Amino acid sequence: MEVLMAERANLVFHNKVIDGTAMKRLISRLIEHFGMAYTSHILDQVKTLGFQQATATSISLGIDDLLTIPSKRWLVQDAEQQSLILEKQHHYGNVHAVEKLRQSIEIWYATSEFLRQEMKPNFRMTDPFNPVHIMSFSGARGNASQVHQLVGMRGLMADPQGQMIDLPIQSNLREGLSLTEYIISCYGARKGVVDTAVRTSDAGYLTRRLVEVVQHIVVRRKDCGTVRGISVSPRNGMMPERVFIQTLIGRVLADDIYLGPRCIATRNQDIGSGLVNRFITFRAQPIYIRTPFTCRSTSWICRLCYGRSPTHGDLAELGEAVGIIAGQSIGEPGTQLTLRTFHTGGVFTGGTAEHVRAPSNGKIKFNEDLVHPTRTRHGHPAFLCSIDLYVTIESEDIIHNVNIPPKSFLLVQNDQYVESEQVIAEIRAGTSTLNFKEKVRKHIYSDSEGEMHWNTDVYHAPAFTYGNVHLLPKTSHLWILLGEPCRSDLVALSIHKDQDQMNAHSLSVKRRYISNLSVTNDQARHKFFSSDFSGKKEDRITDYSELNRIGHCNLPYLAILHANSDLLAKRRRNRFIIPLQSIQEHENELMPSSGISIEIPIHGIFRKKSIIAYFDDPRYRRKSSGITKYGTIEVHSIVKKEDLIEYRGVKEFRPKYQMKVDRFFFIPEEVHILPGSSSIMVRNNSIIGVDTQITLTTRSRVGGLVRVERKKKRIELKIFSGDIHFPGETDKISRHSGVLIPPGTGKTNSKESKKWKNWIYVQRITPTKKKYFVLVRPVVTYEITDGINLATLFFPDLLQERDNVQLRVVNYILYGTGKPIRGFYDTSIQLVRTCLVLNWVQDKKSSSIEEARTSFVEIRINSLIRDFLKIDLAKSPILYTGKRKDPSGSGLISENGSDRTNINPFSSSFFYSKARIKESLNQNQGTIHTLLNRNKECQSLIILSSSNCFRMGPFNDVKYHNVIKESIQKDPLIQIRNSLGPLGTALQIANFYSFSHLITYNQILVTNYLQLDNLKQSFQVLKYYLMDENGKIYNPDRCCNIILNPFNLNWFFLHHNYCEETSTTMSLGQFICENVCIAKNGPHLKPGQVLIVQVDSVVIRSAKPYLATPGATVHGHYGEILYEGDTLVTFIYEKSRSGDITQGLPKVEQVLEVRSIDSISMNLEKRVEGWNECITRNLGIPWGFLIGAELTIVQSRISLVNKIQKVYRSQGVQIHNRHIEIIVRQITSKVLVSEDGMSNVFLPGEFIGLLRAERMGRALEEAICYQAVLLGITKASLNTQSFISEASFQETARVLAKAALRGRIDWLKGLKENVVLGGMIPVGTGFKGLVPPSRQHKNIPLETKNKNLFEGEMRDILFHHRKFFDSCLSKNFHDTPEQSFIGFNDS
């Protein structure tokens, strides 16, 4: 007894808490040492001890035991403060909705986590024997987060869709919840209840499908004799030791393992914990183990490939139903896998980021060239470093160096003073490439109504060229200019023209007149005229005077710009052409589209005699090829294409070639240009009919004589239509050759006399020296009309010479005489082009002007179109042409009753110069203003057509005046940028005399605020030019039937004294965010757009900013009217697809059913290509293809196992790899026969076992074409050897009918078939009856011989590349670095 006591005294007393995992470890070690029976006795004693102690403790719980954490109050206050700041930033437009959501979730998550960590120390300090503390941290049941909900705060909850609700529950269950919090927490609770029910049924069904796939797999042999293995390597610390041990224990080695010359383990030895520890200490070379994947047969498994049975820790017995065990061990934990979707670590990020903190106080320095500014995912400014960055922190006595890895955010500026432990950088977490992320869309809706505006370039998404989806290239604001739209159909009628002022009592205000929006224009028009003008209504409108018209209506005609007429900007080397095609509606007749194109060089500079516009007359258009001729003998010299001289990209005329031509001729012929190698099916000089085959692919379109000419590398084949005359007939025609003969020339002949009705072309053809014949070819005659008709084409007003600019209309023929014209396919060829040529006269006073700057402004406003071609002679007054079209014309008679039949493509365009403008001002009440200062220093010009425009002259303040002058001297150029606006053109007028900032459109005239009162009386169709930060001018949409009520435009006024600092910051059209200081007397109060700048004040139109980051999609057009609740922007942001989003069961099921994942890592495709190249390069092409399918299968198997294990491990469930491997082996064991190359044994598209295909190939000694397929578990269950098993799973009738038709035989090898038919199941003891033992023993030695032979061959052929495979696989195919220990070996 004493001896025993003494022994006990020497024993180590293990004074530590033993939790669940420690208990598991203890039990497994006990089993190893003492065996099962002894261990169960020891465990009994432990159990008794536990119950005894628990009874003695007699623990109880009261509400007083729930101690709240004292620091909670200020933590929550701090978080609320941060949220408030965030809300304010969002309101100012500094962060957008997604950033705000992310940040608020992270703020609250951090708070909640911090509280949770405080909880345990708090208990330990205040009351270590608190029952809650003792029970919750014992490791028996319950976890910290549940206690946290009792005594900390409940924190963030998920809504029924699994999205986070960004309003956290601040109370805990001890304090009690408020009503809102209660409702939010009910979401979570309800989700929990539903999930549990759904989860149980899901897990049950998953188990059923799994067992179905593998029910027939039984251990049938001791050794299948395979030579394959999978390599597991503990090297380079890539995988945790725990996983390594778990992978190896219970497996069987596939190859001997050497340490230097010494063999430390032999083939077919099973691995226990001792051996594993030796492997770890020795860091041995890759260890090749046998797995179910490497077993020879798919319908059973051998003992050695399966390894130890998990129940008794020995090799599996023969006849053990390992398939069913595998299915159940994967299915059963399914009930434990949580389906909860709320997160354990930032929802929106791939794990929360790691921080780099400053080691001490000091000044921070880094190389600014290596970083570029960016935004973090929370919208904070930061620097992104693309390579390793060394940061030095200089404190008083010591210099610290900090290395920041690439792709990290630097959160401080250079030379900034940082304090110790301050966060200076954020390392991007989860940079593993195959961490799938899913893209989530978040829509931002407008919360006010008004006009949309954005202030950087916005590109059209190429997929939606004609739609309204735009992409943002850089971070910018979207603004909604507030205003109350008043929508009316009557605006579509022509009574309201743009720029009209209306009395508030006029008809569009009366609600009963605003007809339903669904009524089409015609109906509305009809209704309108019939009701209002028929005299039945008392308040009908008798004349236009009440409408207060400002514009004028003397348009020569009313045109409609067709809704779909797109602006084609054809890129020609260095200019762009804008054809203005309009379909003109004139008393219900549709006129053909005019096809006038204005041509502007990209740099916007015209020389003298440049062509500014041209018109392609459809009468002079041909589809076929041919030759042009001018007249008969005297050929006029005319402007040819070659004589247009290109000077800096501008076409210009040389006058010496301009001669009069009144008619020209076109001789059609069919031309085929063929490559020199092509075979021609017709002979030279033969005569063919229509639609004769010429070459293999082409047929003739006309009949006639064939001429074949061989050039250097091609053959030209021409077909001339016409009559053939042989010279036997004496006629004078045959003497001519290559002559045009006018109509009426007779051809006399003994038998007949014939007069030609049209012009003909006579050509003499000599096939041989003596013989010749004459071909008479038809000719198409074109008369070129002289100037009288041209006046109708271009507006006559244009052609009068004014002051010093002349425009002339010139016709020119594009092809010289006798030039062959080639038409390709169906393109039509324009023969004559009508051009508008610009010229100007030199002013004697001014120095000679060589260039004119031009720009093209296209403005669309409520169905009104203006085209301004602005031509600016540098030192003369500015000239404008305006083109006005009123699509809404409903047949109103123009005021001067002028004849409207004069359809005119350049309609009502005006060229103004000084004198002319003055006149037109008097006539038309101010269509265009030029504003000249007396001293002629600054000229400002506003393109407006109403007296509603206002002008800001040079300020009286001298300083400000200088600024303007300087800017004019600096850059008087007008740049023309070929970038897209709403119509396809947008233009920068910003530098135009710097007054271009003042271009507004149809502005309300507010010289002082009292005038606002008058505005209450009148409505007005309000549109502006919207100008963005780059000075581009955008024009609103033309289809908009919306009148903005100016009284509701939310103006506010701001007094400020102009001083040097402020005046320079204000420019018209500028947007101002909230709290931006623009005046001395404090910050600006509301965000908005500067509408009017006056000497002592500015008028600002209220606006609301929304921030948008690159990649966001903007909906709607520039200047469009938006209503509350319309979608403004869609953000696309990435959430990580880690274990949080599709978690647990759904994820496992997704993998096992081989469902596709929505988003695939971007670089995956490239990797696969690289991998394929790698294989063929190293092994040569035939081998590359041979092992392609094999490697695909092996690789996909490994990757599937890793994926499934990852899900289970993340939930803390331990499943041995071999169970998963058995199932994965079944779903990857079939291949799809891809060609009918298998000598009629298998059909293409048939699923056959991989091993069967290989054996068949060896037997037939020919290559077999098959491709690897992944079947889901359901599909694999329906593709087994046994139709009885299939039928008892799903689709019974279909399976049985098919089996009967095919005459399938069921060999009853599986368990299920035998259960269904009531036979003995072939497992356990019943297994002995199935395989005669004698045969089994004979087989093995024989196979071993083969094995060695085969092993040698395989080694020679493939696997001196073993290293290569390992490296390839680890590089290319692993989800996480953790798994790249598994390579592939086939030695």
Curated annotation (Swiss-Prot):
Its cofactor is Zn(2+). It catalyses: RNA(n) + a ribonucleoside 5'-triphosphate = RNA(n+1) + diphosphate. Zn(2+) binds at residues 224, 295, 302, 305. It comes from the Eukaryota. The keyword Zinc applies. One of its GO terms (cellular component) is DNA-directed RNA polymerase complex. CDD domains: RNAP_beta'_C. InterPro entries: DNA-dir_RpoC2_beta_pp, RNA_pol_beta''_euk, RNA_pol_Rpb1_3_sf, RNA_pol_Rpb1_4, RNA_pol_Rpb1_5, Rpb1_funnel_sf. The keyword Chloroplast applies. Gene3D superfamilies: 1.10.132.30, 1.10.150.390, 1.10.1790.20, RNA polymerase Rpb1, domain 3. GO terms for biological process: DNA-templated transcription. Keywords: Chloroplast, DNA-directed RNA polymerase, Metal-binding, Nucleotidyltransferase, Plastid, Transcription, Transferase, Zinc. It is found in: Plastid, Chloroplast. Belongs to the RNA polymerase beta' chain family. RpoC2 subfamily. NCBIfam families: rpoC2_cyan (TIGR02388). HAMAP family: RNApol_bact_RpoC2. PANTHER family: DNA-DIRECTED RNA POLYMERASE SUBUNIT BETA. In plastids the minimal PEP RNA polymerase catalytic core is composed of four subunits: alpha, beta, beta', and beta''. When a (nuclear-encoded) sigma factor is associated with the core the holoenzyme is formed, which can initiate transcription. This is DNA-directed RNA polymerase subunit beta''.
